[in-house]
Amino acid sequence: MAGLSRILLSCTLACLLAGQAAQASVDDPTRAGGDNRVRALRADQARRDVLLTACRDDPGHRRGEPDCVNAERAQALQQWQAAAMTSVDAAFSDLAGALRNAAPRRMEAAIVRLTRQLQPLVYSMMTLLVLLTGYALLARRDRPFEWHIRHALLVAVVTSLALSPDHYLSTVVAGVQDVAGWLSGPWTAPDGAAGRGGLAQLDQFAAQAQAWVAQLAGQAANDANPGSAVNWLLCAMIVATSAGGWLCLAASLLIVPGLIVTLLLSLGPLFLVLLLFPALQRWTNAWLGALVRALVFMALGTPAVGLLSDVLAGALPAGLPQRFATDPLRSTMLAATLCATATLMLLTLVPLASSVNAGLRRRLWPNAAHPGLAQAHRQAAARQYAPRPAAAAAAAGPHQAGTYAASATPAPAPARPAPSFPAHAYRQYALGGARRPPPRVRRDDRPAPAPDRRVLPRKPNLP
């Protein structure tokens, strides 16, 4: 969050500088006469064409006259404004279209094509599942009732996927789209007023941002001074960056979780078959965890985007595009600050969703967390370098546990010092910087045998 704060502060300073420079160009009366003549020539196309023709016919005498200079600048500014408006309209239209329709549909089609390529693997897993189930039934072993239910469900799901993959995939895609549409659809406020959904709000905001950037680009084109035009373009770039960042982040929270859920549900039967193998059940647990995480992000992100979009639309004034012409400083600051604030509020949703996901995992699967390599090595390192309790050493006496030799020498100290961090030993081993920690020696926990204190008779000293 510190990096985001620095970025927000830099954007705020840039908004202040650009808006102040643009405001100075608006309030400066020294360039009013030249700017007015250029604007008049831009509006009067017939007079401008006459002046340009006269200047081109007699370039030696009329090239340096103010009328020729103003006519050329008016034509260049008009061409520049047309190019800027066309590029801005095309950029925002392409962005809105890609985020609204093209990108999700293409990704869903790619997921369907990927899952269809796995159909031979599904056939193989279906055959293996049927053979294992038949062998378990013929072996006449006592199985719990839930085992039969689980195997029956697995056989039904995998067989349906293998026999009709297109129907299964179309059902998954349609179901995820219905859930996403219900979450991002219109909602009703507490006072009974109906609000607009997340996607509709994004479409409206994209149109507003396009109008803002077009207004600033038009001001840059209308300004005859190149320095002031650069300031106007800087304001347009700041507004476009902040609004585009909000649009991209909000659209990603609306689209990406649904695509991940579609992919995980499409590959779900392959992970369900792994429940038959105890050594591979952790993969199924990882699949379930990823599915729950994607569902949590879908359930929290989509309503949050709709709510923040509605709040942002209500906070922005109605005549903001017209204010850019008279007060660019406050208008640029207002638009950029509101967009950046909404973006930061969406970014704070990520740790919240992670906390909810962790709580759900602890509640639903308390024993699903498998101790990985890092945890196993941490436990081994803690056992290896743990000091011996004083009470146990005193109770054992001079006899070391597991040996029958009476020796009062203490146990040798470990060759390596204890790591400063629990995962240090595993990290060194994983990175190849140290050998694997030796396994813990199994010691005999039986008590040491009591010494034989019986008095044996002396043998007589015979001559």
UniProtKB/Swiss-Prot annotation:
It is found in: Cell membrane. It holds the Pfam family TrbL. It is a multi-pass membrane protein. Keywords: Cell membrane, Membrane, Signal, Transmembrane, Transmembrane helix. Residues 376-463 are annotated as: Disordered. InterPro entries: Conjugal_tfr_TrbL/VirB6 (IPR007688). Its main location: membrane. Residues 376-410 have a biased composition (Low complexity). Residues 411-420 have a biased composition (Pro residues). Residues 441-455 have a biased composition (Basic and acidic residues). GO terms for biological process: protein secretion by the type IV secretion system. Residues 1-24 form the signal peptide. This is Type IV secretion system protein PtlD homolog. GO terms for cellular component: plasma membrane. The chain crosses the membrane at residues 118-138, 232-252, 253-273, 294-314, 333-353.
